[in-house]
């Protein structure tokens, strides 16, 4: 950790090593330095000067290649408009560093760690470089443990691993944002943890909408900003590829501080991991590298691995990462999603069909998967209950065509029983969220894992349809059923 001249301002830099711009090709700069004073790979360079219209220019770049003849090739982290050949370039002598710690909570940052929310400067006394090695094997926590979210459908059928990576698939309008906000809320309340959201190459409008919804739901506390539960880092799709390629590392660096120094459980969101790969592909082409399969960068697996391997549990704390995964043209064999899948421990798949029925969270119980759902990890009771729920829902899915045309009367007695239980399960998988109280009118519920297992065991064994809709644990469903009987 050290003082960060990029955040304090260029005036704080000691101009030990100064070069000049030799060539500009879009967001790529070639810079000449004096012999014997070449900057290292990943060093941060700052271009200062005046543009053609007399405006002050300050562009931060990152060294990517040493070309020979005392030249380096760097990629800009912001627009290169107004830069000219011959401009002075200062070598900071270190990689890009960003603010970390409690001061980042409730704030929005860009890739450089600069606040962009108009709420004033951030306490930048503690900073950390964005390029770091993954934790050593001896530091890792090798124990397999479930990361309890308090969301029934997730904890029972596709449990998250503490320090694992989860892929979040799905289109617009199925409740991904609300699910993300509920996870942020629950980790703060149940685990005393914090969250870091990395907006990588997505729409600016989506970033703004998320910020507004977080303020409305209390995840970000405007009145007492230090009580907020999340830090936001945005590198949106209108920014140069260098910024989109590095913004994920900026967010991860902030998360690592909470894990390693504050010894907390951290939830890290990356939306969207495909845009990280896409930005790397653009930078690779700009640097003149030979493309690999489908035009992707030859270093795709290396870049993905260097990001993903930093997301893990250590003996101090954990980073559990939820990554939105865009699948281009729905082709799962595309190198970008295929490389991502190799790192995932679980997948959460929102369902448009469930959302249309008004069942929220609209997580598909059959398509969502987890490597943690093994009897030797979660225990026999949890495993058997989850398998029973899946078998019932799968049989119900197979019977849908018969129900739609001839009707329920054509089913056998056993199948009718399965349909009745599956409908109860489907309703019981719904749950009121704390962050959605404002628009559902139902108080939010956090349901512990043991309560979840007990509830589904009771349904599978043939006990208590409407009683299961938007309730927390099984006792509430029982009370609701008793009230209905009394009223009738």
Curated annotation (Swiss-Prot):
One of its GO terms (biological process) is proton motive force-driven mitochondrial ATP synthesis. Its EC number is 7.1.2.2. PROSITE patterns: ATPASE_ALPHA_BETA. It is found in: Plastid, Chloroplast thylakoid membrane. It is an enzyme of class 7 (translocase). It catalyses: ATP + H2O + 4 H(+)(in) = ADP + phosphate + 5 H(+)(out). InterPro entries: AAA+_ATPase, ATP-synt_VA_C, ATP_synth_F1_bsu, ATPase_a/bsu_AS, ATPase_alpha/beta_chains, ATPase_F1/V1/A1_a/bsu_N, ATPase_F1/V1/A1_a/bsu_N_sf, ATPase_F1/V1/A1_a/bsu_nucl-bd. It is a peripheral membrane protein. Keywords: ATP synthesis, ATP-binding, CF(1), Chloroplast, Hydrogen ion transport, Ion transport, Membrane, Nucleotide-binding, Plastid, Thylakoid, Translocase, Transport. Transmembrane segments: none annotated. ATP binds at residues 170-177. Pfam families: ATP-synt_ab (PF00006), ATP-synt_ab_N (PF02874), ATP-synt_VA_C (PF22919). SMART domains: AAA (SM00382). One of its GO terms (cellular component) is chloroplast thylakoid membrane. Signal peptide: none annotated. GO terms for molecular function: ATP binding; ATP hydrolysis activity; proton-transporting ATP synthase activity, rotational mechanism. It comes from the Eukaryota. F-type ATPases have 2 components, CF(1) - the catalytic core - and CF(0) - the membrane proton channel. CF(1) has five subunits: alpha(3), beta(3), gamma(1), delta(1), epsilon(1). CF(0) has four main subunits: a(1), b(1), b'(1) and c(9-12). Belongs to the ATPase alpha/beta chains family. Produces ATP from ADP in the presence of a proton gradient across the membrane. The catalytic sites are hosted primarily by the beta subunits. This is ATP synthase subunit beta, chloroplastic. The gene is atpB.
